[in-house]
């Protein structure tokens, strides 16, 4: 297998459909056109033609599109055949194309990978293709499209350019120490560095928003049996996702629901009631509950308000709180306010949010929705955003750390060499986002997660 091979893959989803598309990219795409179509179509024009088998019989008829390189998606010669979407027809056409020497099936994401390697896309834009396909909400789709069109990359490139100018200034001060003006201490470098830090902080805030749109928030509902966990899952989901009875231990396995709150994906997980297991099935369910809790972004600690007046989680169930991961955020949810007569709404107890509601009637659930959105820093009014992945957040975080360390070197010791090195490392972190400095291993992992025909 060679990266110089001509590749072919189905670009439409498997299964039956009105239209099925095969995409070919590489130097032999021209030969495929001449062999299967009998001619080379006019570049970038839709040509209605028969698709022929090796014996000259017609396999299908449809639209052929010819994009000679470098003016194509991949930067190579690209041919697209748009025929009928029957699996048998597409399979026959694919087999016919693969009889031509030098053709092979594309690896997952190989078309996008070739576009990146041929400078048609940077890495952030290439990732945005997969994110656009996987978008689970309108807001996520719009943000992914912004990333594909270069919004995220432009912000990163602006930061890289600013760091380049700052590095030139710092290194000039190092190389010419005998000048009358002390460039390191005249305040200009500090002012420029502060501007870059402020711009980076703004990009980080927007990237966190973009990461929420892509990844969502994992919320686990946990508590004792019969506290109303499944009722709360149903209330948040807006449908009967879980069976609800008065029998303690009804939920024995993990139940998952995927919803959106004003565009923010929310993965809600209902777990088995936590207690001493009465049988092997319940024991396994409780073990799985703890596994989900340990991986959560937030835990909703469900409390049956009819069983206790306590509001402090450490007082309600100290053993449960002691077992939770140290930095895991907790929201205490006192349920059954319709029975206890408690005032609905949110307050705070010992640093934890406390919400009183009725999962059965739905009263107070909207307060919980808003709390979940706000606790993750999700801003529904942020327009023109972009999607971001965890690797992007890590790169931005590392760049910010290097800039702060560089600032400390500047203000503490006027150490120009150390400042210059921190600026270089920050610049390298940012360049990893767009793929200017990226390992082959990372590229392999990124593109292997794509669809075959992308």
From Swiss-Prot:
Residues annotated for GTP binding in this entry: 226-231, 245-251, 270-273, 335-338, 358-360
Cell membrane among keywords: no
Keyword GTP-binding part of the UniProt annotation: yes
Leading EC class: hydrolase
Comment on bound cofactor: Binds 1 potassium ion per subunit.
Subunit structure: Homodimer. Heterotetramer of two MnmE and two MnmG subunits.
The family this protein is said to belong to: Belongs to the TRAFAC class TrmE-Era-EngA-EngB-Septin-like GTPase superfamily. TrmE GTPase family.
Name the record gives this protein: tRNA modification GTPase MnmE
């Amino acid at each position: 297998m060679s990266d110089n091979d001509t590749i072919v893959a189905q670009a439409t989803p498997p299964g039956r459909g009105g239209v099925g598309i095969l995409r070919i990219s590489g130097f032999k795409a021209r030969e495929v056109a001449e062999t299967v179509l009998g001619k080379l179509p006019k570049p970038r024009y839709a040509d209605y033609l028969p698709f022929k088998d090796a014996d000259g019989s017609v396999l299908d008829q449809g639209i052929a599109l010819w994009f000679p390189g470098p003016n194509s998606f991949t930067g190579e010669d690209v041919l697209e055949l748009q025929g009928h979407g029957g699996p048998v027809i597409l399979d026959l056409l694919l087999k016919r194309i693969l009889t031509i020497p030098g053709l092979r099936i594309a690896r997952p994401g190989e078309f996008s990978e070739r576009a990146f390697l041929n400078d048609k896309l940077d890495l952030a834009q290439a990732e945005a293709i997969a994110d656009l396909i996987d978008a689970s909400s309108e807001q996520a789709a719009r943000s992914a499209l912004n990333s594909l069109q270069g919004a995220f990359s432009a912000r990163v490139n602006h930061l890289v350019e600013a760091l380049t100018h700052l590095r030139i200034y710092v290194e000039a001060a190092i190389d010419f120490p005998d000048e009358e003006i002390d460039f390191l201490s005249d305040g200009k470098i500090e002012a420029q560095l502060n501007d870059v830090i402020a711009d980076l902080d703004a990009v980080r805030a927007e990237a966190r928003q973009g990461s929420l749109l892509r990844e969502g928030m994992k919320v686990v509902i946990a508590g004792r049996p019969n506290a109303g966990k499944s009722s709360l899952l149903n209330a948040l989901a807006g449908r009967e996702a879980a069976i609800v009875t008065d029998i303690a231990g009804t939920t024995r396995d993990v139940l998952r629901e995927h919803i959106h709150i004003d565009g923010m994906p929310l993965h809600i997980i209902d777990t088995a009631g936590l207690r001493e297991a009465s049988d092997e099935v319940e024991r396994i369910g409780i073990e799985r509950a703890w596994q989900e809790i340990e991986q959560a972004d937030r835990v909703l600690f469900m409390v049956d308000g009819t069983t206790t007046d306590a509001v402090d989680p450490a007082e309600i169930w100290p053993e449960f709180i002691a077992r939770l991961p140290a930095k895991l955020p907790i929201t205490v949810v006192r349920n059954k306010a319709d029975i206890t007569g408690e005032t609905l709404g949110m307050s705070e107890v010992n640093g934890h949010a406390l919400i009183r509601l009725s999962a059965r009637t739905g009263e107070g659930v909207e307060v919980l929705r808003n709390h979940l959105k706000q606790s993750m820093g999700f801003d529904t009014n942020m327009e023109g955003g972009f999607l971001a992945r965890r690797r992007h957040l890590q790169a931005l975080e590392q760049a910010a750390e290097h800039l702060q360390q560089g600032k400390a070197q500047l203000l503490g010791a006027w150490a120009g060499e150390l400042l210059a090195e921190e600026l270089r490392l920050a610049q390298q972190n940012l360049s990893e986002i767009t793929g200017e400095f990226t390992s082959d291993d990372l590229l392999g992992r990124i593109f292997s997660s794509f669809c075959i025909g992308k």
